[in-house]
C-alpha cells in the first residue's frame, strides 16, 4: 500500500518566525502520526532556517516514528545523519537563497563524491535516497552510486497542473505524468524504490498516487496549510484517504 511521509518543516517555520518555542515540530510529528502518517520528513538545512538540530535529536529520542532526513551532501550533514541514524537519508540540492528546494540533485556532476556519501550512510545502516528530476540519465547515475531510493521531483507536474486550471487531462499535465511514470519504470527496473514529492496537494495528488509501483509520497506545505483550518490529524487523514483511493483504483 502506498505510504505518506509528512514533512513538518513548515511547523518549524512558524516557530522560527517569532524565534520562540512553539509550535513544536516534534509534537507536530506525533499528531501527524496519529492522523495516519507512515513517516516524518525533516530537512535540516545548513542555514538552520526552520528545523534545528535539537528538533531532529528529540524526534529520535522521544518518538518511534519512521524518520526521513533530507540533507545536503556535506561532511557536516553526513556526520549528523550517521550519529542520529534516521531510517532514511535523502540527499537534496541546497541553495541559501532559495525559498524551497528548486530542482533535483545533479548526480552526474558529482558522481564520485556522492558515491562516497552514499557509502558512508549505508555503512551506518541508513537507507539512502536521492531527490532527482525525472531524467533517465540521473536515474541511471543514482543506481551507479548505490542509492536505494529515488524520489522524483514532482514540481514540474504540480506547476503544470496549477497553470492548466487543475485539469488533470490537459496535455501539459499528461506529459508530466508520463515523464514521472517512465521514471518510475526505470527506477524499478534498476532495483530501486520509487518515491515522489514536491508541491503535491489535495487537488493534484491522485494522478500520481495511482501510478504503478510508487511506494511513498512526501508532502508538507499542503498538509500544514490544511491543518490551520481542520487540525493536523484530520489534514493527514484526508490526504491518506485521497492517496489510498487513487492507489486502489490504479492506472
Swiss-Prot record:
Instruction: Quickly give the catalysed reaction.
Output: 3-amino-2-oxopropyl phosphate + 1-deoxy-D-xylulose 5-phosphate = pyridoxine 5'-phosphate + phosphate + 2 H2O + H(+)
Q: Where do the annotations place 3-amino-2-oxopropyl phosphate binding?
A: 7, 18, 199, 220-221
Compartments (UniProt record): Cytoplasm
Pathway(s) the chain acts in: Cofactor biosynthesis; pyridoxine 5'-phosphate biosynthesis; pyridoxine 5'-phosphate from D-erythrose 4-phosphate: step 5/5
Q: Which Gene Ontology molecular-function terms are recorded?
A: pyridoxine 5'-phosphate synthase activity
Which annotated residues bind 1-deoxy-D-xylulose 5-phosphate?
9-10, 45, 50, 100
Sorted UniProt keywords: Cytoplasm, Pyridoxine biosynthesis, Transferase
Where is the site described as Transition state stabilizer found in this chain?
Answer: 151
Active-site positions, per UniProt?
Answer: 43, 70, 198
GO CC annotations on file: cytosol
Q: Which GO terms describe its biological process?
A: pyridoxine biosynthetic process
Its function, per the record, reads: Catalyzes the complicated ring closure reaction between the two acyclic compounds 1-deoxy-D-xylulose-5-phosphate (DXP) and 3-amino-2-oxopropyl phosphate (1-amino-acetone-3-phosphate or AAP) to form pyridoxine 5'-phosphate (PNP) and inorganic phosphate.
Q: Write down the PANTHER family for this protein, in alphabetical order.
A: PYRIDOXINE 5'-PHOSPHATE SYNTHASE (PTHR30456:SF0)
Q: Which family does it belong to?
A: Belongs to the PNP synthase family.
**Assembly information from the UniProt record:** Homooctamer; tetramer of dimers.
Q: Which HAMAP family match?
A: PdxJ (MF_00279)
Its name, as the record gives it, is Pyridoxine 5'-phosphate synthase
Amino acid at each position: 500500500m502506498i505510504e505518506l511521509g509528512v514533512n513538518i518543516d513548515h511547523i518549524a517555520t512558524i516557530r522560527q518566525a517569532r524565534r520562540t518555542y512553539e509550535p513544536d515540530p516534534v509534537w507536530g510529528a506525533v499528531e501527524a502520526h496519529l492522523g495516519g502518517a507512515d513517516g516524518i520528513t525533516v530537512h535540516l538545512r545548513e542555514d538552520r532556517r526552520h528545523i534545528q538540530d535539537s528538533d531532529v535529536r528529540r524526534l529520535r529520542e522521544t518518538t518511534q516514528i519512521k524518520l526521513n532526513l533530507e540533507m545536503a551532501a556535506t561532511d557536516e550533514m553526513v556526520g549528523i545523519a550517521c550519529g542520529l541514524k534516521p531510517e532514511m537519508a535523502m540527499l537534496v540540492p541546497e541553495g541559501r537563497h532559495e525559498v524551497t528546494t528548486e530542482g533535483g540533485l545533479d548526480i552526474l556532476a558529482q558522481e564520485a563524491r556522492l558515491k562516497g556519501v552514499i557509502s558512508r550512510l549505508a555503512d551506518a545502516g541508513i537507507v539512502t535516497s536521492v531527490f532527482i528530476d525525472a531524467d533517465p540519465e540521473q536515474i541511471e547515475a543514482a543506481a551507479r552510486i548505490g542509492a536505494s531510493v529515488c524520489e522524483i521531483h514532482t514540481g514540474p507536474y504540480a506547476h503544470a497542473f496549477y497553470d492548466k486550471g487543475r485539469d488533470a487531462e490537459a496535455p501539459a499535465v499528461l506529459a508530466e505524468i508520463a515523464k514521472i511514470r517512465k521514471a518510475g519504470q526505470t527506477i524499478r527496473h534498476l532495483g530501486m524504490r520509487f518515491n515522489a514529492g514536491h508541491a503535491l496537494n489535495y487537488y493534484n495528488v491522485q494522478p500520481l498516487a495511482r501510478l504503478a509501483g510508487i511506494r511513498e509520497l512526501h508532502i508538507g506545505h499542503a498538509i500544514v496549510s490544511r491543518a490551520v483550518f481542520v487540525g493536523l490529524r484530520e489534514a493527514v487523514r484526508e490526504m491518506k484517504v485521497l492517496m489510498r483511493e487513487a492507489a486502489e483504483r490504479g492506472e
